[in-house]
Curated annotation (Swiss-Prot):
Involved in ubiquitin-mediated protein degradation. Regulatory factor in the ubiquitin/proteasome pathway that controls the turnover of proteasome substrates. Targets proteasomes to the nucleus and facilitates the degradation of nuclear proteins. Keywords: Cytoplasm, Nucleus, Protein transport, Transport. Its main location: cytoplasm. Residues 54-68 have a biased composition (Low complexity). It is found in: Cytoplasm; Nucleus. The gene is STS1. The keyword Cytoplasm applies. Pfam families: Cut8. Residues 24-85 are annotated as: Disordered. GO terms for molecular function: proteasome binding. This is Tethering factor for nuclear proteasome STS1. It comes from Coccidioides posadasii (strain RMSCC 757 / Silveira). It comes from the Eukaryota.
Amino acid sequence: MNSLVATPPIPPHFYEHNRFNTTSRFVSPMNPAGSRKRKAEDDNGSSDHDTRMSASPTSSPALPTKPLAARQIKRPRPNLSGRPLSLGRLFETLDSDALRSVLRSLCDRHPELGQEVVDTAPRPNITSALQVLSNYQSTLQSSFPLGGNPSSDYAYNRVRPHVMNLLDALNDFTPHFLPPNETHPSTSLNYLDGVTEIIHQLPRWDTPHYNLEKEAAYEEIAKAWALVIREASKRGGGIQLQYGEWDQKLAKHNQTSGGKLQDAVHELSASLGWMAGNPSHPGPGCPQADTASIRQQLLSGTYGAGLPLKVGPW
């Protein structure tokens, strides 16, 4: 009876105290000195690191700063809807044929725009004009029927519209390169040289009266040659005609055409009467021939080459 002693009850706050102290009993004790040493090293390292980071460099060069361009960001339209193209974008979609059609239609409906277009458009040059004529020539050559006689009446009827288109273009382009509209004789001569080659390529037909169109083209181009030669002979004593070998070029064209350019050849001979081998040039005793001979020697730098050099008092 004496061994069974009633155990007094344990107050609740005692359990709370033991619960908080239970973890500390299982944690291994740490070295106080080591803990203090590591803490001092960490503090010193952190202090040195802060000092290095806060210090500004003394020897590093200053890098130039470039101002950044403000980016222009296109924001999407809040209300997107269909709309037609602007005039500039519309022109970008048109090829040369469509653009010519639009301009021709505008000029027909508004005649006052025609002169403004002429004043605004760049002046046609030899290359562009001959290219247009060459395109007509290529269309003509490709329109011949396959097989058969290319100079027959059947072939003529097939290609006649293209022949007329080429001849109409020749009649329109040639006056543009003639004086007084064209003030440079070299430009006129080079154009006539190229366009005469195109006339040489016109077909010859078995029926004689079908060839009248080509002969008329030769007649007109011969008149153009004569006009340009007369104007060129007035500039610089005809030096462009003499040193441009135009006598040889024109003689070759005349031979290819079968003598259709003989009038132009005579005009060139009259303008350059001192040329060797010219049957129409004046005789040696004529004052005009003597003047031309002196001019020729001055231009070639041989004047006075055969005269003795006089030394001493005059």
